[in-house]
């Protein structure tokens, strides 16, 4: 994967990362969060809604990454299973590729996605949901970064800390 090539092929990637598999292979400097949303085909009855309530998902099949690699997704799954059993969950691979988005468009299922991916597929509409789930994004870099990468990361941390004293 490209993640394991950090430090060889390139110094940095910027991306969403809550993956235990990825974080075993790289460092991450968090820069912010993206909200978890739902995507549906343009023909789906929910596609016309400006915002979804969780109850709008009752009776739907929600496609989401399989359990075990993402604490954010695992938390959503646990909450839905416990509090909203009327939502059926279908596992997808841990990392979405175009086949996952195509499957959502073709099946009429609902896909758990991110606000930053709202325009990723022309056949899907991404809709905010009335919940507070999000996933961090940030600067991904090698577990053994060279000195110039370390200096850059320290400089970014310093800038972030000066703008937000609560930044760690």
Regions found by a protein language model. Name each.
Residues 24-36, 40-62, 150:
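Flexible hinge/capping segments at coil-to-helix
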């Amino acid at each position: 994967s490209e993640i394991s090539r950090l430090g060889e092929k390139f110094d940095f990637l910027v991306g969403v990362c809550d993956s235990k598999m990825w974080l075993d292979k790289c460092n991450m400097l968090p820069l912010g969060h993206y909200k978890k949303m739902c995507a549906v085909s343009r023909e789906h009855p929910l596609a016309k809604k400006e915002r979804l309530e969780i109850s709008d998902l009752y009776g739907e099949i929600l496609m989401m990454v399989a359990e075990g690699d993402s604490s954010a997704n695992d938390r959503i799954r646990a909450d839905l299973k416990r509090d909203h059993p009327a939502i059926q969950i279908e596992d997808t691979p841990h990392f979405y590729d175009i086949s996952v988005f195509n499957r959502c468009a073709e099946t009429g299922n609902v896909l758990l996605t991110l606000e930053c991916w709202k325009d990723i597929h022309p056949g899907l509409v991404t809709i905010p949901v009335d919940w507070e789930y999000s996933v961090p994004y940030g600067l991904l870099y090698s577990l053994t970064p060279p000195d110039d990468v370390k200096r850059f990361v320290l400089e970014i941390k310093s800038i972030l800390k000066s703008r937000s004293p609560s930044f760690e």
